[in-house]
Structure formats: structure tokens, C-alpha cells
Design a protein with these regions (language model features):
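Feature captures the catalytic ectodomains and active-site-proximal regions of enzymes
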Residues: 2-398
């Protein structure tokens, strides 16, 4: 590790560019408090890959070693991180990475939203509401899509997370109109009374029996508290957001936002930025693992998505420069072999790679996802005003 320590002494920052890639829901084993969340025994990665997989590049970065597979000439620095946020969802997982852990969690509505809230939404939008249950997104549009097409009513549903989702057929409610409806609902639910983390637009197309959700999803979050992205921005370090990162942080302290259609599109955009020139943080989320396969409990599809990522990963690695750092992590688990359809409370991986790394090494488990954000601040020589998390670079000196 001495090469890293020497580099840090010589220049203001060790790496000019940091690529932080979140493999949404790729957990690596039950967290110490998993039983409290009903997730004992969950292990998204291990249960997905089984004994037949083609993940050679991720294997060299140390990912598979984190779930008990044999170490094979690793090139990356790898470890697990423990969640300390009070949830097991996208927003809180990403928040924790960036130094935010809320003492009072957002509210969830496992039995549906209060009728007075539904009434307010109907009055404000001029449309009736159907659904109002906790449900799978694909399942509810199959069940209520035809009624929605006949009546124009909004399909409203939730999940185990703090979300209010509104599904609408693009021919019944055009996407831009759906976005405006979600903006209206965001204003209604922004206060402490309902305390809903995200309002999500869920457009879909097709006919009864063959409805399909489109990539035009849009999340409406609340402004996050002070976090790593704010400190980077304050110090002149830009953040490029790929995927749903800009939605999660409500576009706050983000210089460039890029939407993606799917994981492959996200990887191609990552590779394009790696080939180009920029300085700062590129923060990306690849969501197919969670949205298409985890919630649907599709182990085969989940493994295929991992193998697709593994296929494109060497192209990204090839285009990294000596002063680039790649960090691959996750925000929570979503074991496709587990009961139910919800996220699972798990450790997440932290894989670190740069062309200057000579050999791989496993580091001890991190006590919080916030160590990622603390490391990014340390890299750019920015004091950690958040007082949460410790720089992983400190381990390089041991």
C-alpha cells in the first residue's frame, strides 16, 4: 500500500477522479441486526450465484471472497460495510454513504395511505384513486391497469419503503402530466404529517395481460440534509450523477445529471465518461438488479444481470487512468431467493480499484456505509464536517 501513501503526501488529492458505482441491492450477507428486520439468513450475492457463474472480473476485485468463495489473485481492495441507518431502502442506503443517518426514519404505510391523504390527492389532481395498498409494481398494473385505462384513475401503491408510487398508462395520462401530478403530491406530503421519503412516477405501456413499465420513472425526493455532495460542491469539486442518483438527492449539489434506460446503458455512459476528461466524483446507480430481479425474486435474471455487468466491467477498467479510483458498492440487499418481495438487511460490498494498485487485499469490515463518503472527502483533502465515517485510506497505513 506504500504507493498510495506516497502519492497522498505529494499531491493535494490522491485521485483526480472517483467513480462510485452502486450495484443496487447487491448485498453480501445478513447484517448483525438482520433478525430485527425479519431478514435472518439473507445473502443476496451468495444465493444468487450458487456454484455456477461467470464473474471472473468481479472475482479478481474480491467481491466473491466476501461471501466465502476462494480468493483468486485479487487486484482490488475489498471489504464489507455494515448499515447503521434505520431502514433498508435505496434512499437511506445512499444517504448513509454520503454521511447522513436520520434519527427519526421516514414513515411507511404497509396498510395503505390514510384516507384523508387520498382525498387530498383526488381533490388536488381531479382524478380518482384506485389501489392504495402495498404491492409489487408489476402485479398492481396487471390487476388494475385495465380499470385505470377505462376510468383514468390514478393507481397509487406503496411498498415496505417510505414511498408513494403513482402508476399511469402513457396513453391515458401522458408522462409530463404524470410528472406534474407527482410534483403536486410531493408538495402535499412534504411535511411532518405524512413524512414520505419519495413520490415515484411509474409510467407503463401495453394492453391488458401485457403491460410493461417504461424507463421514464421519476423520483421526487426531499432535499437531503448536509452531506458529502454539498461539501464537495462547496470546495469546487463537481459531482456527475448517473441513473437515479439525482432523484435520490433531489438534484442538490449535482453539476451534471444523466438518466439511464438500464444497466447496460448506465455502463456505456460510465465508460464514455472514463474515456473523457473531468475532475471530481462520478456517482452512478445501476438499478436493474433490484427493480427487475430482486423484488420479483428472479434468481436467474439477477445472475444474468451480474454477468452482464461483469462483461462490461473490463472495458471500464481499461479506460481508467492512474489517478482514477473506482469504488463499487451497494445500498442494501434484495435476496431473490428470500421470502416476500422486499429488500433485505445486509452488509454491502466495498470494492476499490485503481491501475496503481499492485495487489489485492481484504480489509476489516467497516462500521458504516459513511466510510465511503469520508474516503471521498479525504481524497479531495476536504475536512469531514459531518463527523460520520472514517476514511478507508487510513487502513492503507497499517
Amino acid at each position: 500500500m506504500s504507493i498510495l501513501i506516497e502519492a497522498k503526501k505529494e499531491v493535494k488529492q490522491m485521485f483526480k477522479r472517483v467513480f462510485l458505482v452502486v450495484l443496487d441491492s447487491v448485498g453480501v450477507g445478513e447484517a448483525p441486526d438482520a433478525e430485527k428486520y425479519g431478514d435472518s439468513g439473507a445473502n443476496t450475492l451468495l444465493h444468487t450465484i450458487g456454484d455456477a457463474y461467470n464473474l471472473d472480473v468481479l472475482e479478481k476485485l474480491g467481491l466473491l471472497t466476501l461471501v466465502g468463495k476462494e480468493e483468486k489473485n485479487t487486484r482490488g481492495i475489498y471489504m464489507r460495510a455494515k448499515p447503521i441507518n434505520l431502514a433498508k431502502d435505496t434512499l437511506n442506503g445512499h444517504y448513509e454513504m454520503m454521511g447522513i443517518v436520520q434519527k427519526v426514519p421516514y414513515k411507511t404505510y404497509p396498510n395503505g395511505f390514510p384516507l384523508e391523504l387520498i382525498s387530498k390527492i383526488q381533490h388536488a389532481t381531479g382524478r380518482e384513486v384506485i389501489g392504495n395498498i402495498a404491492a409489487s409494481g408489476t402485479q398492481i398494473i396487471e390487476e388494475l391497469g385495465e380499470m385505470h385505462m377505462k376510468t383514468g384513475a390514478l393507481i397509487i401503491y406503496t411498498s415496505a419503503d417510505s414511498v408513494l408510487q403513482i402508476a399511469a398508462h402513457e396513453e391515458v395520462i401522458p408522462v409530463e402530466e404524470l410528472y406534474k401530478i407527482c410534483e403536486t403530491v410531493r408538495k402535499i406530503t412534504a411535511g411532518e404529517e405524512y413524512k414520505i421519503a419519495r413520490i415515484i412516477a411509474r409510467p407503463f405501456i401495453g394492453r391488458p395481460g401485457s403491460f410493461t413499465r417504461t424507463p421514464k420513472r421519476h423520483d421526487y425526493a426531499l432535499d437531503p440534509p448536509l452531506n458529502v455532495l454539498d461539501l464537495l460542491d462547496k470546495n469546487g469539486i463537481e459531482t456527475i450523477a448517473i441513473g437515479k442518483i439525482s432523484d435520490i438527492f433531489n438534484n442538490k449539489s449535482i453539476a451534471v445529471k444523466i438518466k439511464t434506460k438500464d444497466n447496460i446503458d448506465g455502463m456505456m455512459k460510465l465508460i464514455d465518461f472514463a474515456k473523457g476528461e473531468f475532475k471530481g466524483l462520478l456517482f452512478a446507480n445501476l438499478n436493474d438488479f433490484d427493480m427487475l430481479y430482486g423484488h420479483r425474486r428472479d434468481r436467474v435474471g439477477y445472475l444474468r444481470a451480474l454477468e452482464e455487468f461483469n462483461y462490461y466491467l473490463p472495458i471500464l477498467l481499461k479506460n481508467l487512468k492512474k489517478d482514477d479510483l473506482l469504488i463499487i458498492t451497494a445500498d442494501h440487499g434484495n435476496d431473490p431467493t428470500y421470502k416476500g418481495t422486499d429488500h433485505t438487511r445486509e452488509y454491502t460490498p466495498i470494492l476499490m480499484y485503481s491501475p496503481i494498485f499492485k495487489k489485492g487485499k481484504r480489509l476489516q469490515d467497516r462500521e458504516t456505509f459513511a466510510d465511503i463518503g469520508a474516503t471521498i472527502l479525504d481524497n479531495f483533502n476536504i475536512p469531514n464536517e459531518l463527523h460520520l465515517g472514517n476514511s478507508i485510506f487510513d487502513e492503507f497505513k497499517k
